[in-house]
Curated annotation (Swiss-Prot):
Signal peptide stretch: none
Full protein name: Protein SPT23
Superkingdom as given in the UniProt entry: Eukaryota
Function, as annotated: Dosage-dependent suppressor of Ty-induced promoter mutations. May exert its suppression effect through protein-protein interactions since does not present any of the motifs generally found in transcriptional activators or DNA binding proteins.
GO terms, biological process: cellular response to cold; positive regulation of transcription by RNA polymerase II; positive regulation of unsaturated fatty acid biosynthetic process; silent mating-type cassette heterochromatin formation
Species whose genome carries this gene: Saccharomyces cerevisiae (strain ATCC 204508 / S288c)
GO terms for cellular component: endoplasmic reticulum; endoplasmic reticulum membrane; nucleus
Gene name linked to the record: SPT23
Amino acid sequence: MMSGTGNVSSMLHSYSANIQHNDGSPDLDLLESELLDIALLNSGSSLQDPGLLSLNQEKMITAGTTTPGKEDEGELRDDIASLQGLLDRHVQFGRKLPLRTPYANPLDFININPQSLPLSLEIIGLPKVSRVETQMKLSFRIRNAHARKNFFIHLPSDCIAKDKFFTSSDDPTNLTIPNRDINERTLFLDAFLLCASNNNSNNFKQTYVCNRCINREKRRASRRKSGLNDNSIWQNNENKRAIIFNSKQLFIISNNGLSGNSNCINFDLPTRIVCYCRHHKATNGFVVLFLLRDHNGDILAKTITDPIMIMDKKNASNTTTPTSTSNAQVSPMTNDTRSFSSPQSDLNFPSEFPLPSNSKNFVISTNCMLDSNCNNNNNDNDNKNNIKTNTAMMNNNRHFPSPNSSSEDSNHSFSDIHFSNNNDNNLHRSLDSWSSTGFNSSSNPALTTLTSDFSAASARHTGKRQRSVNEPFMSTPNTFSRLPQKFIDSSKDISNHNSVPVALNNKPSIQRVIPAQGSINGGIEVTLLGSKFKQGLIIKFGENIALSSQCWNESTMVTYLPPSSKPGPVLVTIVDPSETSMRNNSNSSVSTSNSTNDILHLNKYTGEKAIFTYVDDTDRQLIELALQIVGLKMNGKLEDARNIAKRIVGSDSSPSNNNAGLHSQNSSLNSYTNMMRNINDEQLITEVIKSFKRNNNLSTVNLSMCDVRGRTLLHLAAFNNWYSLVSLLIKYGSHLNDQDLFGFTPLHMACINGDLRIIRLLLECNVNIMKKTRNGFIAKQFFLMNYTVNKTRYSNYETSLFDDILTRLTKNTTGSSDTQPFERNVSQSSFNSSLFDDDDADHDYVQERKYLLADSAALAPEQSNCNDNTSFSILDSDSGYDISDCESSSDEIALEFFNTHKIKDFSSKPNEIPKTTKTSIEPDGSLWNRMLTRLNDELPKYEDLFPKKPKNWELGSKSVEIGPDNSAQMTVDDSQTSSEDDELEALQVGFNTIFSKKQNFQNDKMLLFFWIPLTLVLLLCFTLSNLGKDDDMFHNLSKIVQEYLRIGLAKVLLGNERMKTSFKMQLSKFQNNNILNDMRVN
């Protein structure tokens, strides 16, 4: 390495000669940087080297002589490489100082005429509707530009998205660039977001970023790799604008001849608007004001874009076309704006369900499958068009099913995803052929891996077990083999109807049912995937109408499963009520039957494999609910039914160590098992409830406790045809009119699947038959829909019973709907009806059949003339009686009363209650006990608290009988005397009545002998303390009392020893400062 001044000088001359030989225009900046590097690397030279000093002088002379004519002489090359090198040497990126940008009011530039400015600015690619998460690609076109081809664009500091894109400057408010060449070639772009005006006037409104959107952007920035750095952009800048650019603050633009005009320069900017229109009440949307300035601050161009709506939800129809903001003709854009969108921006899928990382691969594989299907079904020319159309529609119409919180029987996996297309039949057929093949690991392992990833993500979110990833899209092909012949015939008719191409274009179709099976009790959430869905459609599972239906979009519907009378597979069909005018008036029997028939006979549409399978698990639900009731009684808390069963059986007990103990345990277990085999589930639950009765614990057991769907034991027992359990529950005070989450009462459940005896029993209990379910059906409609078809199966007696029940339902339908099951003036002993006398008898079907044969003929005609207030049945929850009222009389008394006072006693005067039915038994229990045991009772009526006086109420206790002969012999004096006596007696009775109405309170003694004296003592003490002198007897006495109280409380709380210890500790900490010693010396 050479050293010394001569060496550096020789290197300088040789380097300059070499540069001038190769290129006639030496770059002074490049020359300076190279020479400085050589000088630093040379150990013998320094910064004070004469060669370097001569270099600086030479540079100054050369710069002074060549700068004025630099552009004319072409010393600085006007190509991208030279300008980029110049930018890299003089400008550094990365914000290091806090932003303190000056405030700029955009309304000051509204009235500037764009035609008077030297340049013209056009904005292309701004959509009409967008979201805050969507990044838009805006194309800028500068017309009438300078003769130069290349420029620098400088973006405002308030619109930069990330810290690494800022230009590092010591003064952020200074917009000039240190290098003069860069500064002169820079165009400064400004952007302001404004609220659009109602008309074409310039009445715009300034906007800002609201606090909610700032917090959202903070969370968004904190998720990046840069972390808190980008988060600080939204914290320390008060003038942050609502439009941001995801680009460097300073970059180069060039004209590559794309526009065909050398005076036009184009460049693109990824842009995002970060605030919603509704946050600023911008009903007409936002507009963006763009300004273009030079390095001196003069405005060169101005433009205002068309309005854009920033909405929360994505527009349903993706037909928004980019608009151009200019008066000139704009050529169509060929760039794909979706490349700047987030992966979830085009999916109708909530943000809490993240997409897998390889979702793009899945879309590619889907297109490949679509291409193969198209190649198999069409010729080569049609394939190209179909593939383009299908791919475009796949990008625009990708819909995922709603991930609502499903019920306990529903599962979701990635195989449930359905890509819908509502406009192209070829894509519809290709999707059907693709979905019928299912996911197979051998045929497509990539899809299997992707499916497992998505299923794992869903399992982490829902916490439930998911289906296997190898499960096919549809049910097994042999599902139809289990259907009845009549069901297959009806399904053929529907499938033939759906096979018409014209009908498929306009009618809804179901492609998938999730889950594919559920309980016959209903109540679970079922998701339907298909096409052409709309709000207002009626979903039917077999002949049962769904409890509720909600349309999410054209390809997804969410329904709730209705109860069914029998298990097995059924077709899921769609009914369009708009095709037939439905009569919803259910008050009359004619209109009710007509509306039901209209629903049953409407045109049904379904897919080829829309099948749902009902599973009978009512026994299990009954056992679980009964175990929960028992566990609540045993432990005082709700537990899982499995744990309660283990505790009852004794599985938690430790096993015996000796063989004799094991043998005895096994023998007892075998005997218990043999005993349980002879007892069915109904008898088991019945015996458990009776055991509470025998132990006098029935009042503490809540027999009306419900499950997660709001159904009680009475609901499930009536649905499962358990007549004995229903009778026992009604006798022990179970609630008769309770409704579940979907509005079903026990009568509704009995009309769907219950025995006719159960329906009649509930009707005799005078339940409210006019209660409607959530979907607007009453019990009679369910009874007609589920029993009209099977009417011929019953015997002659049951057919007559069917007619009798239908007559009662029709007759009661026209009556009052607010009748309560029981009234206050009915005898309490009548609540224990003879229907429940035989508790220990075997409720065999033959015996019950004989009972109904014996009583139906006698009771039906007589009860038809009875008033609802005089019905003999058990106590319902809505009547307000305690459960103990049902047990006030023995079964023998109830039977004797029922046989003695039959319904014929009321046939003479239906509105008058006989005197024999008036009770003389006082209600059992106080108001507090009733409040604890019957929390669901209604409040007492005014007539119950203050009963009306009877019409024959007399003033005196004596009654005077006046015969017809004596009344004729009365004189005028006697009448006057009797009238005066009556007035005096009436006055005396009036005074007695006033005093007799005095109410006795239990707290009168407490008020007179404690509270009033205590109040007087406190008032006296307060008066003496305020009015007396400081040294009087009262104050001295109060001080003594206070001292003794303090000492006494201290002894009680701390004790004598503790008090002494604490006192000594306080004395040891006492600081005397030698005062005692000084006093002792003196």
